[in-house]
Regions:
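Conserved small/polar residues in nucleotide/adenosyl-binding loops
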Residues: 151-155
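GIY-YIG nuclease signature motif recognition
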Residues: 40-42, 51-59
């Protein structure tokens, strides 16, 4: 299943977002990041072994990230901290089987998992979105395990 999963890590800034979107627009698997629902993790390295993270899902990663960087910084201080930090990055996770329900379940599982990680001092998104059955629900465990393997090997 590995070729179905796409994870990109970019610096958390408008400039890097725009550069990445241009690259994804011409890549073979870019549609899984730009035109499919995605899950994303924004992390900020506070010290050598201390991170704060935000886990989200969206149907439009470009516009959602712009909202976080431009408008949300005026509403919640942690968004300003993420945007001003030179150590913030964002993992964008796409998959050809992602639909809204599956991304909500992946987001929920990632929040639960990251809350248990010793080096993560804060997970800022605390809403839960557990879904009932849906078309690809039987793939949740396998896709989540693959994401965790790739994310933890890169983080």
């Amino acid at each position: 299943m590995g070729n179905l999963l796409k994870i990109e890590n970019i610096n958390y800034s408008l400039e890097d977002l725009d550069n990445s979107v241009r690259k994804w627009n011409i890549s073979a698997n870019g549609k899984f990041l730009l035109r499919y629902p995605t899950v994303y993790i924004i992390n900020d390295k506070k010290s050598e072994n201390n991170f704060e993270v935000y886990v989200g899902e969206t149907a439009d990663i470009r516009n959602r990230t712009r909202q976080h960087l431009n408008a949300d910084t005026k509403v919640k201080s942690f968004w300003e901290d993420f945007s001003e930090s030179k150590k913030s990055s964002m993992y964008v996770i796409g998959h050809e089987l992602f639909n809204k329900s599956l991304t909500l379940d992946i987001e929920n599982r990632l929040m639960q998992y990251l809350l248990s990680v010793e080096n993560i001092s804060r997970v800022h998104n605390s809403r839960t979105n557990q879904q009932n059955e849906y078309y690809t629900s039987e793939m949740l465990d396998e896709i989540f395990s693959e994401i965790c393997l790739l994310y933890t090997s890169d983080a």
